[in-house]
Amino acid sequence: MMENYKHTTVLLDEAVNGLNIRPDGIYIDGTFGRGGHSRLILSQLGEEGRLLAIDRDPQAIAVAKTIDDPRFSIIHGPFSALGEYVAERDLIGKIDGILLDLGVSSPQLDDAERGFSFMRDGPLDMRMDPTRGQSAAEWLQTAEEADIAWVLKTYGEEHFAKRIARAIVERNREQPMTRTKELAEVVAAATPVKDKFKHPATRTFQAVRIWVNSELEEIEQALKSSLNVLAPGGRLSIISFHSLEDRIVKRFMRENSRGPQVPAGLPMTEEQLKKLGGRQLRALGKLMPGEEEVAENPRARSSVLRIAERTNA
């Protein structure tokens, strides 16, 4: 079933070019998906190069296992644990580049059975890995109204979070929701002001998906681990699709591109300053898709690619 889904990788060349591939380098594709980035990386590696791919989606793992290449290996798990995967392989400080393509993929959105989309009726699941954790339906049936409202406001930036949360809880008391169409209808009915350019359930589905998959915590942990695993000169190439993701990436790169913040006038010797360490990253800027790519793939419209390089500090 999954092979029927056409998937166009957003900012494909730009993200891989951002890694500045060395033929003998060791790279991580933290979000294998359907393998667009991984295949391009492999095409640029020599015989000594290595690529470690990660994904927590079983369908992505099935696709990855079709790649017969001794330079390639796949791990079924969250990219937040990349530090552990690298340590297990004795590669700490030896990784030449990490690529992350954040958020939900087109095949996940387009497969109604995964429950990510309000446009297609399916089980109200939304898990990146359907074998682990609570589904969206299970969480919405057991969560407090205040907690649902907080999630919708925090992760969906939903203006009517309290009203929608109340409607969800009331509906689940009457009859537990198990389908995406049911949730979309409840949200639409509870939304007093409609945006003619956006479905009223858009923010709610984004928020619940982010919460169910701990997406923002996953990003923060992966970024933190990247500083430890990257070799000097190693690159970070990260694509985000909404402001919450991009804010985390931007802040991380900005904070680690600065040297130690020492209060003005505080007496410190040169030796003490050295112990504080220097900046750990050099931000190399951001890229956004061009008009042609957006025309071919409208989902690319909101994407942002940020690139940074590990320093010697």
Curated annotation (Swiss-Prot):
<dbReference type="InterPro" id="IPR029063">
    <property type="entry name" value="SAM-dependent_MTases_sf"/>
</dbReference>
<keyword id="KW-0698">rRNA processing</keyword>
<comment type="function">
    <text>Specifically methylates the N4 position of cytidine in position 1402 (C1402) of 16S rRNA.</text>
</comment>
<keyword id="KW-0949">S-adenosyl-L-methionine</keyword>
<keyword id="KW-0808">Transferase</keyword>
<feature type="binding site">
    <location>
        <begin position="35"/>
        <end position="37"/>
    </location>
    <ligand>
        <name>S-adenosyl-L-methionine</name>
    </ligand>
</feature>
<dbReference type="GO" id="GO:0005737">
    <property type="term" value="C:cytoplasm"/>
</dbReference>
<dbReference type="Pfam" id="PF01795">
    <property type="entry name" value="Methyltransf_5"/>
</dbReference>
<feature type="binding site">
    <location>
        <position position="79"/>
    </location>
    <ligand>
        <name>S-adenosyl-L-methionine</name>
    </ligand>
</feature>
<dbReference type="InterPro" id="IPR002903">
    <property type="entry name" value="RsmH"/>
</dbReference>
<comment type="similarity">
    <text>Belongs to the methyltransferase superfamily. RsmH family.</text>
</comment>
<keyword id="KW-0963">Cytoplasm</keyword>
<feature type="binding site">
    <location>
        <position position="108"/>
    </location>
    <ligand>
        <name>S-adenosyl-L-methionine</name>
    </ligand>
</feature>
<dbReference type="GO" id="GO:0070475">
    <property type="term" value="P:rRNA base methylation"/>
</dbReference>
<dbReference type="InterPro" id="IPR023397">
    <property type="entry name" value="SAM-dep_MeTrfase_MraW_recog"/>
</dbReference>
<keyword id="KW-0489">Methyltransferase</keyword>
<feature type="binding site">
    <location>
        <position position="101"/>
    </location>
    <ligand>
        <name>S-adenosyl-L-methionine</name>
    </ligand>
</feature>
<protein>
    <recommendedName>
        <fullName>Ribosomal RNA small subunit methyltransferase H</fullName>
        <ecNumber>2.1.1.199</ecNumber>
    </recommendedName>
</protein>
<dbReference type="GO" id="GO:0071424">
    <property type="term" value="F:rRNA (cytosine-N4-)-methyltransferase activity"/>
</dbReference>
<feature type="binding site">
    <location>
        <position position="55"/>
    </location>
    <ligand>
        <name>S-adenosyl-L-methionine</name>
    </ligand>
</feature>
